[in-house]
Amino acid sequence: MDTFTALTADEERFERHLAEQVWANSKVARAKFRRVAVAIYLLGAAMLSSGAAVLAYRL
């Protein structure tokens, strides 16, 4: 509570602190998005390769 009171007393400091938090959150979200995108592509490739293996086995 004391930190919040200190930050709201100085508006410029509060805005800077808020901007830093938004920037940090956006970096985390971007990293998560990239990892999820890679995981989805790898899952698709695994499904296609397993389907191809089944087709090759049946021939």
UniProtKB/Swiss-Prot annotation:
Keywords: Antiviral defense, Cell membrane, Membrane, Nucleotide-binding, Transmembrane, Transmembrane helix. The keyword Cell membrane applies. The chain crosses the membrane at residues 36-56. Pfam families: PycTM. It is a single-pass membrane protein. Its main location: membrane. GO terms for molecular function: nucleotide binding. GO terms for cellular component: plasma membrane. It is found in: Cell membrane. GO terms for biological process: defense response to virus. InterPro entries: PycTM. Pycsar (pyrimidine cyclase system for antiphage resistance) provides immunity against bacteriophage. The pyrimidine cyclase (PycC) synthesizes cyclic nucleotides in response to infection; these serve as specific second messenger signals. The signals activate the adjacent effector, leading to bacterial cell death and abortive phage infection. A clade D Pycsar system. This is Pycsar effector protein MePycTM. It comes from Micromonospora echinofusca. The gene is pycTM.
